[in-house]
Amino acid sequence: MISKYCLFVIVLGTTGTALVLTNDSNKLQNVKAVIAIQDKVLHFHDHTTDCVGELMCIFAALPESERNQTLSIPLGLLTTIATDKGRDRYSSIYAEAKKLLAGYPTIKHALNAAENGHSTKDKNVCASMYSKCPFEPDDLLDTINDLEDITTLFSKNVFGKVIADAIEYNYTQVGMTQTHS
């Protein structure tokens, strides 16, 4: 799926804020290739993007305290951008992310789904909105939580395996190695 999208820690103080901005900007730069690959993977493996849409909707519908626990993954940052309506103080980061995402229509669909979740605040409503996806909301959330561990993703449902394949493909494109069982 969409390289599951999420990452933020609030740091108080001027130095901390600058560090957060720099770190988030670097994270956005690092996910460019992943987003491009994920857009292609989504297009080829989930033509309706219902599972991606449901996942993003469910993720955005989570209470803020739960959503904040997953802010270490790129999906969190992108979901935050999608649902914030531009109110965030760090507008340079948002402008950078929106510019990055502008060329990826499948990703845009996923971000629109995040907006739906932010509005409904109910994972069951999200599941009914994206009824073509065969996975339960909790299974999709588990996939997000496993993003950092490709080995775990490979052992999950087909949706998790597609994501793991995309991540592994990205590693091979940039000359990194990633192992899994």
Curated annotation (Swiss-Prot):
Annotated compartments: Secreted
Tissue spec. comment: Component of the organic matrix of calcified shell layers like nacre and prisms.
Signal sequence interval, chain numbering: 1-22
Major location (coarse): secreted
Keywords, sorted A to Z: Secreted, Signal
The keyword Flavoprotein belongs to this UniProt entry's keyword annotation: no
Domain of life per record: Eukaryota
Protein name in UniProt: Mytilin-1
Organism taxonomic ancestry: Eukaryota, Metazoa, Spiralia, Lophotrochozoa, Mollusca
